[in-house]
Amino acid sequence: MPAFFCLPMACQRQVDSIDRSQSNLQAIPSDIFRFRKLEDLNLTMNNIKELDHRLFSLRHLRILDVSDNELAVLPAEIGNLTQLIELNLNRNSIAKLPDTMQNCKLLTTLNLSSNPFTRLPETICECSSITILSLNETSLTLLPSNIGSLTNLRVLEARDNLLRTIPLSIVELRKLEELDLGQNELEALPAEIGKLTSLREFYVDINSLTSLPDSISGCRMLDQLDVSENQIIRLPENLGRMPNLTDLNISINEIIELPSSFGELKRLQMLKADRNSLHNLTSEIGKCQSLTELYLGQNFLTDLPDTIGDLRQLTTLNVDCNNLSDIPDTIGNCKSLTVLSLRQNILTELPMTIGKCENLTVLDVASNKLPHLPFTVKVLYKLQALWLSENQTQSILKLSETRDDRKGIKVVTCYLLPQVDAIDGEGRSGSAQHNTDRGAFLGGPKVHFHDQADTTFEENKEAEIHLGNFERHNTPHPKTPKHKKGSIDGHMLPHEIDQPRQLSLVSNHRTSTSSFGESSNSINRDLADIRAQNGVREATLSPEREERMATSLSSLSNLAAGTQNMHTIRIQKDDTGKLGLSFAGGTSNDPAPNSNGDSGLFVTKVTPGSAAYRCGLREGDKLIRANDVNMINASQDNAMEAIKKRETVELVVLRRSPSPVSRTSEPSLNGSSHQLNHFDAGSPDSTMFVTSSTPVYAS
């Protein structure tokens, strides 16, 4: 009989794993301490405030998870658990590690993330068996100087801290495969970073780097490199010597050009180079035969190289917000292309070869100067979205055939064509031969049209060659790609008539995640209040009503007159370094909208709630002086340079009443008038002000 009673107790002593996670525990249950041979204890997601000293008598414990509790102290007795191989202290309130941690010689995984550490003891590096060390979201200002002693380290995560420098010994981590230093305050990387020959993933985004060490090419195993949101001007010339690189993110920097060795990146699949200062795209890009996604938005590109057509595996090409006047004919060789976004350029025509992109599902050419579209768009059977305007309510439009009298060829058009600012019969390619070549493509052997009669797509439904249904509705604009960085803006914004290239004054200074959320909510509330006060309507009007209201608004704008007053405005940049204004015009650009031909610089946007708004700057103000620099005959570049010099910006402006480009004094009348929702305060990229509709789907 006693044997039957002893059996359960014997079984209990053999228990080696206990899971009491999410049990609303205030303390470690006493019954746990009876299991002397316990090896795995999971107490995550409870309300435990301290670790009972009896816990440290469980000498066989190998895995201890006390993450997501309310621990403030890690007792020195932790050093008694000499068999420990995994310790998870994530999401607690521990501010200091005891030196006795060095006794845990078998420790392989240590997670200290989301604790208020300001420093780690040097003795932690005596645990040379550690392979994974997580230090994300602490308050670390320094890593241990002897971190190179962790010779078995494979993963080091130190994202979202206050690190300004990296110990030189880090280059001794020859087995390191993943290094995440993103969202810190780093100004430089160790010159010998290339010694990390096993490194596969390197994230150093959202820092203050101005360059990358040349030695980085020594990381020949690297396949993921993210240096986005820094202040990098040039990339190392030998960047192409990383043969395994597949994903490269250099977004939001000040990069002028890509290195000549770029074509050596034969395995590169994704390149994000948006929001830089690129004026030219190297022809070497065509040698990156594995490239599937290419993001070049918000640069200063005036053309694309012909070698773009060599990218046969390219599925996504985004060149929004540049200065492109034409697209090379070779684009037709990109047979895998599914998304082509050319929004907000100065395109006057698309090549006939666009019809050879047989897999194209989204074509975005809004905010250009296109008088019509090439007839070959009729053979894009898979097209689900054709964007021609910011005010467009349907993804696919009814297109009809017409003729280009200048070239004598058939083209297609719709009620949104010609686009605003389209110049009848004149393009900006500047090459007669170029135009001749494109015209000669008509009737060529690679694209054939069954019906040459002037019919609408709707009437063509019974044609022998089915041209697809161009009446599909509610096709969504493509979602943001799965890669890290988000889009610039998710709003459908109104298009400006006669809109020149706009400049936005944005500092490179970045906010923390917490402060950004607060500012986002504040901006959203301000926008909502202002919309309510001014009666701004966001409903989409019919094309006929838009045309009538546009005429009325044009007449009203011509009546703008009255007294002119000089104002001196001092603007203190906010915590993020932003002013919250945009301007247009200047000596080297077209006149600002509604400026009556005045070549001066005019404020075209003041973000509600911004520093500029609070200091009294208003849309329509003409810049006279900026920080003691004369703006009468200045260019936009001159203004930018003058304004960026100081934290406190002093502007002398000339204000006419009523304001010549006022947008907030009257309710929104039509699709071409300006609304107040110019940017999405909840977007990861809401620091960039956008002055026209940009439903961007690239990440």
UniProtKB/Swiss-Prot annotation:
It is a peripheral membrane protein. SMART domains: LRR_BAC, LRR_TYP, PDZ. Residues 659-676, 684-699 have a biased composition (Polar residues). GO terms for cellular component: basolateral plasma membrane. Gene3D superfamilies: 2.30.42.10, Ribonuclease Inhibitor. LRR repeats lie at residues 37-59, 60-81, 83-104, 106-127, 129-150, 152-174, 175-196, 198-219, 221-242, 244-265, 267-288, 290-311, 313-334, 336-357, 359-380, 382-403. Pfam families: LRR_14, LRR_8, PDZ. Keywords: Cell adhesion, Cell membrane, Leucine-rich repeat, Membrane, Repeat. The keyword Cell membrane applies. Expressed in the terminal web of the intestine. Expressed in seam cells. Expressed in the basolateral surfaces of epithelia and the nervous system. Expressed in the intestine, epidermis, excretory canal, reproductive system including vulva, uterus and spermatheca, in both larval and adult stage animals. Residues 584-665 form the PDZ domain. Residues 656-699 are annotated as: Disordered. GO terms for biological process: adherens junction assembly; apical junction assembly; cell adhesion; cell-cell junction assembly; embryo development ending in birth or egg hatching; embryonic digestive tract morphogenesis; establishment or maintenance of cell polarity; maintenance of epithelial cell apical/basal polarity. It is found in: Basolateral cell membrane. PROSITE patterns: LRR, PDZ. InterPro entries: Leu-rich_rpt (IPR001611), Leu-rich_rpt_typical-subtyp (IPR003591), LRR_dom_sf (IPR032675), LRR_R13L4/SHOC2-like (IPR055414), PDZ (IPR001478), PDZ_sf (IPR036034), Synaptic_Scaffolding_LAP-MAGUK (IPR050614). Disruption phenotype: Worms display a severely affected epithelial integrity, leading to abnormal morphogenesis of the pharynx, intestine and embryo. RNAi-mediated knockdown causes defect in the apical junctions between cells, electron-dense structures are observed which are discontinuous and greatly extended along the lateral membrane, or absent. Results in polarity defects and strong cellular adhesion. Disorganizes the ajm-1 containing apical junctions in embryos. Belongs to the LAP (LRR and PDZ) protein family. Critical role in assembling adherens junctions; adapter protein involved in polarizing protein trafficking in epithelial cells. Necessary to maintain, not establish, the entire terminal web (organelle-depleted, intermediate filament-rich layer of cytoplasm that underlies the apical microvilli of polarized epithelial cells) or brush border assembly at the apical surface gut cells. Required for correct localization of ifb-2 intermediate filaments in the terminal web. Required for dlg-1 and hmr-1 lateral localization. This is Protein Scribble homolog let-413. It comes from Caenorhabditis elegans.
